[in-house]
Amino acid sequence: FNQDALLECARAGTLAFGENYAQEGCTKIDWFRTNHPELHLEWHFIGPLQANKSRMVAERFDWVQTVDRLRIAERLSAQRPDNLPPLNVLIEVNVDAEASKSGISPEELPALAAAVSKLPRLRLRGLMSIPAPAETYEGKMKPLLAMASLFKAFQEKYPQADTLSMGMSADLTEAVE
């Protein structure tokens, strides 16, 4: 969506927005902060993050939902300005082991979470996953339930974790269940 559409949404009460592309998101964030500083919007980066774009994301976004490598987490922490609160992050889990998707395997989660939780300018808030598309209710629910179970175990180790972000429009109803 362009800035005008987002402005209309913000005036209607939507205050959190997700962006897939770092440059496009940063342009929108800068525009809002310059032209509408009265709006206190929350910006989530939800796309794959390349190392060469980490600084712009660390300097502008409030959340990164796609942390899947320690190198990216370390860069985000090092590049987060001291005058901003710690960057909220979610670790992306590839629950269906899809070759075409980003994210770590559930087995890799403990090691990455332990390392991310120690980074000073990041706040580990939880997990994110985009399950494989499925036609049936059961097919949609299987990876969502696996993620819910993984998140429950994750919260035992990280009680501050309060966010589980899952699914897309096609499985929204099932993800909310």
Regions found by a protein language model. Name each.
Residues 1-170:
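Conserved alpha/beta-domain cores
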Residues 169-177:
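Acidic, divalent-metal-coordinating active-site segment for phosphoryl/phosphodiester hydrolysis
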